[in-house]
Amino acid sequence: AAGVVSYGVMAFVMTAAPVAMVNHGHSVDNAALGIQWHLLAMFGPSFFTGRLMVRYGKERVTAVGMVLLAASGVVALGGLGLSHFWGSLALLGIGWNFSFIGATAMVTDCHTPAERSKAQGMNDFFVFAATAAVSFLAGSILHSSGWQAVNWMIFPALALILVPLLWQGRYGRN
């Protein structure tokens, strides 16, 4: 579920962001630059995300990623300036990296070696089906309710994952 939420939240906001930027008076070039920085933020941390998981644990790295995704929403809700859009997109990228890589690594922890390939395949199916759905939904929500609504909508999904992760960290596994 953490992978579905992390990828879904990222795709939902990323899909709407460039359109929202142009709708709020920013140039297409600035919207494109925001997405370029977002992509760097998505993949740049990969050089050390694995080491962070070894040192701090997959659950903690995933939780930090979810918090960064939420911070992205907070920054986006803070205003409509270029710095708000770019800052939000950068946090969205880093948050996705930590949360998605951590979540993906946790999938195989729950299964026997014989089940892992099938579990990973099912996980990927749900992740990318949800991503396709929210990508379509993002445009509709942006058009009908606006950029602020897009960003408010991410918090319940993030809480759905973050609360159990924090609970697990506090009280351990049963």
Predicted segments — roles?
Residues 72, 83-91:
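Paired small-residue
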Residues 115-144:
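A late C-terminal transmembrane helix in Major Facilitator Superfamily
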Residues 15-34:
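Short amphipathic helix-loop junctions that connect adjacent transmembrane helices
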Residues 98-112:
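Intracellular juxtamembrane helix-capping segments at the cytosolic ends
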Residues 60-75, 155:
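Structural signature of the two symmetry-related core transmembrane helices
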Residues 140-158:
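A membrane-interface helix-boundary motif in multi-pass transporters
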Residues 1-10, 90:
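Pair of pore-lining "gating" transmembrane helices in MFS-fold secondary transporters
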Residues 44-58, 142:
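Helix-to-loop junctions at the C-terminal end of transmembrane segments
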